[in-house]
C-alpha cells in the first residue's frame, strides 16, 4: 500500500475541526458540549448487539492500574476502560463529553464544568464533584509525587461548587488544558483508594469493572451494569493478554484465541489485507512517534556533541524500510502530517552525514569510538530490530552498540533509574505537542527519562505551554522543534500509522487521536 493510500483518509478529516476546537477552547471561548456520547465510527456496520467476550491481545503487559502513577501505555490501555475522564477526543478529533456534560470559561484563568448526575463508581459510591476535586488535588499535591502532575502544572486547584459542578482555577492561561483533560487523567474515588491498592485494584465509573489480574497472564473486565450511559457498554467481558510478539498475536487471531489484536507483523500487512473472510483492520488513523532516548544525565551523552553525532549517523529511511515495512512515516518530529502541528522541520536534513558525525566524535575526544548500550522492551520486537539496525549504522563511525532486550518491568526500572546509554521508545500522548515535549524534556518532569536538564529548555517549554492563543503557539512551535532536535537527547525517527486487527464480526473499534483503547462502543455482530 502506498504512502498516499495510507494517509489520504486521515489528512483532510480533522485539520479544520481540530483548529476550530483549539481556537474555541484554548483561547477561552465558552463552550457547551452537546449530547452525551460521540457517534459510532462510520465504518461500524449494523445495529449494536449486547453480549459476548472481546479477547484482546496488546503489545505489552500492564504494571500499574493507578491513573495517577501509571507511566506505561500498556497500563493505560486497560484501565481507560475502567475509569472515565471529564472529556474525550472522538474519532473526528472533537472534544466530547465524558463525566462533564458541559463547560464554559470563567474569565481567562478559570473553567467551570457541569457534571453528569447519574454515574456510579464500581464500589457503589455515587460520583460527585468531590471526586473530581479529590482526583486533581491529589494529583497537584507535590508531596504525592504523581508523574501525571507535570501535565497540569498551571492548575492551581479544583473546587466543588455544588454536587455536580467544579471549577478549575489556573495560575495563567493554559493552551493545552482540554487536550490534557482528554488524555491524561481519569477520575478516582477517595474511598476506593483507601480500601484497596489502586495500583492493583482499579475502581472507576467506566463502562467495565475490574474483575481479576493474573500476573503475566491476563486481566479480566466485565460490563458495569450501572454505567451512566443508557445501553452501554455492549460487551459482557473483555480479557486482556499481552503475547510475546506480533507473530503470536496474529496466530492467536487466526486460530480464534483472540478476536482483537493491537498489531501484526508489518511485513505481512499487504497479504493480510486480502484475507477479508478471516480478519479486518480498522482505518489507519493517528500517528505516534518512535524515538531514541539518549541519557544526558551521565557520560557520554552529557556532551551535546556526542548526542549530535548519533543524530547525524542514524539513517531513518533505512530503519523504516527494514523494520517497519513502510507502515511508519520517516520523520524527525513527533507530529508530522496530517497533524495540524506538522512543521516539516529537520535539523539533520540531508543526513546521515557520517563525516560530520566522525568530526563531532573527534571534537568530543572520542575519535577512537564508543561502546554503548541500547535498552529496549523485549515485548516490542520492532524496537529490538531497530536496535539491531542501529548497531550496524553506528559501526560506520566506530561506535559499538550492545542491544539489551528486557522484560517490561525490568526495562522500566532501568529506564527510570537511567541505567542506559540509548533506549528505544514510543509515545502515545500527542493530541497537543506540549504533551510530548513538556513531560519528556522539562527538568521538573518525572517522565524526563533522558535526564536532560536545561534552563533554556524549561523557558521555551513554559512559553509554549502558557500561551493561550492557538495562533501564537503555532508560530513558536517550529523553532521549538528545531531547538530540541539540535539539543539531541530525543531523536525521533518515525511515526506509526495506528490500526487495529480483528475478526470480521467485531464492530465499533477504531483508533483515536488519544490512542486509548476504549471499548465502550465495541460490539460483536
Walk through the language-model features, giving the residues of each:
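N-terminal secretory signal peptides
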Residues: 1-20, 26-32, 40
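Gly/Pro-rich hinge or "lid" segments in bacterial periplasmic/extracellular proteins
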Residues: 90-94, 174, 179-233, 237, ...
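Surface-exposed binding/hinge segments that line
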Residues: 104, 114, 148-191, 212
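Ligand-site clamp/hinge motif
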Residues: 226-271, 283, 391-392, 400-402
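N-terminal lobe/hinge region of extracytoplasmic solute-binding protein
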Residues: 57-107, 137, 203-205
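Long beta-strand-rich cores associated with HINT superfamily self-processing modules
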Residues: 502-525
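Extracytoplasmic/peripheral linker and loop segments enriched in polar/acidic and small residues
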Residues: 400-411, 416, 438-504, 525
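Structural transition elements
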Residues: 329-363, 380-383
